[in-house]
Design a protein with these regions (language model features):
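Mid/C-terminal beta-alpha module of Rossmann-like enzyme folds, strongest
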Residues: 98-152, 197-199
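Glycine/proline-rich active-site loop of Rossmann-fold NAD(P)-dependent oxidoreductases
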Residues: 30, 55-66, 73, 101-112, ...
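A conserved structural motif in NAD(P)-dependent oxidoreductases
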Residues: 88-95, 106
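Conserved beta-loop-beta element that borders a ligand/cofactor-binding pocket
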Residues: 34-58
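Conserved Rossmann-fold NAD(P)-dependent oxidoreductase catalytic core, especially the SDR/UDP-sugar
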Residues: 1-27
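Conserved C-terminal active-site "lid" loop/helix of NAD(P)H-dependent oxidoreductases
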Residues: 127, 147-174, 190
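Amphipathic terminal alpha-helices
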Residues: 178-199
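A conserved pocket-lining segment of Rossmann-fold NAD(P)-dependent short-chain dehydrogenase/reductase
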Residues: 69-90
Length: 199
């Protein structure tokens, strides 16, 4: 069994590794890791995969399409503060490969990071979105983030760099597909038919 959580809440502001424990008191979703470890202790071959803030690629219905829709609706592509906070990301095909390896080869209780881009400054994400939508790129003050981004403001403000070095060493997994910025540059995120997210 493979449990999915995420890297964003593991160690905000510092590079999260596979050896960092989730503080399940800080967010209910992280309690899934406690459950996975309990199953592993009972002999169930359970592992944990932690993707980053963006699992990207064609058909993405995650946070990046939400940011694009917010930019379209607001008429600007924004980042928060100086935009130096970092988002980790992985291409969906690389993530799928990691899940397969985890199912096949992971020892009970193992933790893996589905991370290719260890930490992309959110300003870079906003700049690519602004360029493709031909919109100004602006900074939003942290106290105004919720007014501008709605529920997404909390997530876009997180500084959550992460590493997958131990995952690559232990499973032989190597990200082979485009990083998030290069994937955005292809343009498929900005096609009219790609707008499927309600802000």
């Amino acid at each position: 069994m493979v449990i999915t959580t995420g890297t964003a809440l593991i160690k905000p502001g510092q590079v999260a590794t596979e050896e960092d424990s989730a503080d399940s008191d800080s967010h209910p979703r992280l309690r899934a890791e406690d459950a996975a470890k309990a199953f592993a202790a009972r002999g169930v071959r359970t592992s944990i995969v932690r993707p980053g803030a963006s699992v990207h690629g064609e058909g993405d219905h995650g946070f990046v399409p939400v940011l694009i829709d917010i930019a379209r609706d607001k008429g600007v592509s924004a980042y928060i503060g100086d935009g130096s906070n970092r988002w980790p990301a992985v291409h969906r095909l690389d993530a799928a490969h990691l899940y397969r390896l985890a199912l096949q080869d992971a020892p009970a209780g193992a933790v893996f990071h589905a991370i290719a881009d260890g930490g992309i400054p959110t300003r870079e994400i906003a700049e690519v979105i602004g360029r493709h939508l031909e919109l100004p790129v602006v900074s939003i003050a942290p106290q105004d983030a919720t007014d501008h981004f709605g529920w997404m403001g909390m997530f876009f403000a997180i500084d959550a760099p992460a590493s997958s070095a131990l995952t690559q060493e232990r499973l032989g997994w190597r990200p082979a597909h485009l990083g998030l910025i290069d994937d955005l540059e292809l343009g498929h995120y900005f096609a009219p038919e790609a707008r499927t997210v309600t802000v």
